Amino acid sequence: MIQRRTVGIVGTGNVGTAAAYAMFNQSLASEILLLDQDTRRAEGEAMDLMHGQQLVGGITCRAVEYAALSNAQIIVLSAGASQQSPDETRLGLLQRNAEIFREIIIQLDKHAPNAILVVATNPVDVLTYICQELSSRPNRRILGTGTLLDTARFRALLGRHYGVDPRSVHAYILGEHGDSEVPIWSNATIGGQKIRGETVLGKEWEEEAMQSIFEQARDAAYEIIDRKGHTDTAIGLVIARIVRAVLEDQQNVLPVSTRPDGAYGIDDVCLSVPCVVGLEGMEKRVDPGLSDEEREALRDSARALRDSRADLTVGT
């Protein structure tokens, strides 16, 4: 018997809707199930997508309650509170989102205990850690989108700089999805040729130019938010990429947020390292052979993430 491929999305704001559109347009699943506290919003998004069904094929989309997620193989968590006022602290916002996620995890452990969870709400690394702490499912089955988007931005900018298809660029940003993230220059390559300190495709390595490229990738969200008020399109594609890797058991190596479990001397935190992603979620970790400087920067990133949740309290 052929099993229907079912994807759930909890939270139909800008990011959840962009993810639904990306998956719908790519026909990644048999059905996409949308759930939101604002049920009419979820219904409206499902209706809007279904009006394009004839153009993409037999995929269906509908608004549901938690019980309907029982057959979902993978569920995206894109719900979250927005800042209530300019005076609200980052910790205050994080505290409210942590409480929202606690309620979500209670429902998902009850109705969809076997589903892979993909966390997309920011701060994604801290919320991925919270989900792993609260959920009864194995940690490997809870991933965060992490630095996959940062890495995509990084490769796109490097591809533009060197005049090649970004898919021919192999370079990672690891660690926190945020200010402490780390560019991995030591093994960044184009066509197998290392970039750092080398002349590639007629372009010499210039430290200042490369630092600028990294900073553009790291700070891209701020620039986009300044212009359009939010980010959604690219992160929607990133979520679809992870969903495809899981549903099709692709065994892709992707920088997603998970627990290093002692790798690089890091524990008790979620951050992005290269992982093999397949049907079971995070199936293996890959050690890309970081330089001593990069390893220390990754440990600094882990410390920053631990500090960010130091005063957080989440009931169980």
UniProtKB/Swiss-Prot annotation:
Its EC number is 1.1.1.27. Substrate binds at Q83, R90, N122, P123, V124, D125, D150, T151, A152, R153, T231. GO terms for cellular component: cytoplasm. It is found in: Cytoplasm. GO terms for biological process: glycolytic process; lactate metabolic process. Residues 296-310 have a biased composition (Basic and acidic residues). One of its GO terms (molecular function) is L-lactate dehydrogenase activity. Residues 287-316 are annotated as: Disordered. NAD(+) binds at V15, D36, R41, Y66, G80, A81, A120, T121, N122, T145. It catalyses: (S)-lactate + NAD(+) = pyruvate + NADH + H(+). Pathway: Fermentation; pyruvate fermentation to lactate; (S)-lactate from pyruvate: step 1/1. Allosterically activated by fructose 1,6-bisphosphate (FBP). Coiled coil: none annotated. Beta-D-fructose 1,6-bisphosphate binds at R155, H170. It comes from the Bacteria. Its main location: cytoplasm. The active site is at H177 (proton acceptor). Keywords: Allosteric enzyme, Cytoplasm, NAD, Oxidoreductase, Phosphoprotein. Pfam families: Ldh_1_C, Ldh_1_N. The modification Phosphotyrosine is found at Y222. Catalyzes the conversion of lactate to pyruvate. Belongs to the LDH/MDH superfamily. LDH family. Homotetramer. This is L-lactate dehydrogenase. The lineage of its organism: Bacteria, Pseudomonadati, Rhodothermota, Rhodothermia, Rhodothermales.
